[in-house]
């Protein structure tokens, strides 16, 4: 082996002769001889025995590092049993008893009553607890019935209130459905809401100075409006799209008429200056 492993092993376990290293080149007899017998070792100085388990190193005489399965008697039992750390426990894994260990009596408190007395006392305690639970159950059942009746009495006016609220909500919904939705451009504050004149015809739309100025500005840049721009102007000026469309149609007709008159006047003026 390497010197590093040897040094670490000797540093970890100061008793070097007690823990001889395993030589893999020798035979099985030599390997068995290289270990110390577990009977000659002191369990108090090399390991602690808790619940019968041997926690020391190299206690078995088998070839394995932790010991073979067949040598459990030498591995798990110490020749010098210590009553301070463990009790002699002999547990049978195949027995169906609830407490198979032989030292089950040591688990309970010392100086207690016999098992028959314990069983009678536990039965009496269980009987008392059962009667107490039945009393509690009866009291809780009576309280639950009272609460249920109280809830039923309270639920009746609540249902009536809910029915009234639903009826009022339905009536309000029907009234809202009958009334049309009002948009800002539908509110014509500058004109009368009755759109009929004295002779039964539609009244002429009266535009304010602000509305006329904004429409003239828009017509100066664009003589034809897109639907998007028309909706924007309608919301800004509190007018309807139809009103803006009609205004632009009338303004285009006026512009054509003015240009026609201007062109005619220019033509007549030009013809007048001809020789």
Swiss-Prot record:
Q: Could you tell me the keywords of this UniProt record?
A: Developmental protein, DNA-binding, Homeobox, Nucleus, Transcription, Transcription regulation
* One Pfam family from the record: Homeodomain
Protein transport as a keyword of this entry, yes or no, is no
**The keyword Transcription is annotated on this UniProt entry:** yes
Q: Where in the cell is it found?
A: Nucleus
Q: Where is this motif: Antp-type hexapeptide?
A: 182-187
Instruction: Read off the SUPFAM superfamilies from this record.
Output: Homeodomain-like (SSF46689)
Give the DNA-binding residues. 200-259
Role played: Sequence-specific transcription factor which is part of a developmental regulatory system that provides cells with specific positional identities on the anterior-posterior axis.
What protein family does this chain belong to?
Belongs to the Antp homeobox family.
Protein name from the UniProt record: Homeobox protein Hox-B5a
Native source organism of the sequence: Danio rerio
Protein's gene: hoxb5a
